[in-house]
């Protein structure tokens, strides 16, 4: 599982870069085996603290490996050295559990690359997607989870269920879900949405004209 959320980065890890550059093979976890870059005030980072609290170790026997990439992915981060979109297309799914987004382009970008996504109805995209999918059903390409101020654990459970449902699909079913992702993304292309911007500007100009007169 990749957590690609920017934090207060200090620098790229020299020890990790050496392992990658020299193609060193080992089953022993490194010091702080979750994070690709050193952070300022690492002891206060909420992501690292929760990973530790949850008991993850990234050992060879762990079924789930976590990689926290805390930098902006511009292709020059010193470790991955690939832009965000080149990494996105390598994912099986994405999760953007928005607490508030006027629109939220990241889940739309995900399905535009055929990567099924999980979002919430507190994102504008999530509200739009709910008009085209039945809800929290990742098989449709987008799962929209209901979220409010009081249902944190229910949201976590719903996201977990969606991930497990996707993980249980076979190759053919996964390919169909990717196709549905592409199809839904096509409905949100700029050529479809430009009419709403034109209407908004028309209304704004009308009101401005009335004020001037």
For each of these PLM feature ranges, what is it?
Residues 5-8, 70-73, 95, 99-101, ...:
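Short, flexible loop/turn elements at secondary-structure junctions
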Residues 190-213:
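C-terminal alpha-helical cap of glycosyltransferases
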Residues 3-86, 142-144:
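Nucleotide-activated donor-binding/catalytic signature segment of Leloir-type glycosyltransferases, i.e.
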Residues 90:
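Conserved acidic catalytic loop of the alpha/beta-hydrolase fold
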Residues 86-87, 109:
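Acidic donor-binding helix in nucleotide-sugar-dependent glycosyltransferases
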Residues 93, 97-179, 183-185:
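Catalytic binding pocket for nucleotide-activated donors in carbohydrate/polymer assembly enzymes
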């Amino acid at each position: 599982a990749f957590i690609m959320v920017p934090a207060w980065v200090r620098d790229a890890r020299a020890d990790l870069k050496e392992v990658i550059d020299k193609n060193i093979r080992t089953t022993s976890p490194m010091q702080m085996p979750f994070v690709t870059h050193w952070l300022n005030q690492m002891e206060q980072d909420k992501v690292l603290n929760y990973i530790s609290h949850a008991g993850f170790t990234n050992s060879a026997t762990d079924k789930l490996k976590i990689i926290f990439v805390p930098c902006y992915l511009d292709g020059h981060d010193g470790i991955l050295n690939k832009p965000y979109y080149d990494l996105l297309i390598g994912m099986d799914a994405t999760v953007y559990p928005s607490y508030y987004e006027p629109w939220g382009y990241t889940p739309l970008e995900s399905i535009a690359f055929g990567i099924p996504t999980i979002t919430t109805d507190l994102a504008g995209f999530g509200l739009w997607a709910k008009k085209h999918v039945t809800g929290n059903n990742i098989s449709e390409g987008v799962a929209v989870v209901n979220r409010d101020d009081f249902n944190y654990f229910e949201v976590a459970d719903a996201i977990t269920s969606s991930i497990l449902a996707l993980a249980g699909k076979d190759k053919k079913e996964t390919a169909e879900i990717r196709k549905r992702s592409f199809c839904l993304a096509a409905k949100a292309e700029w050529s479809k949405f430009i009419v709403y911007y034109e209407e908004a500007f028309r209304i704004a100009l009308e009101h401005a004209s009335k004020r001037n007169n």
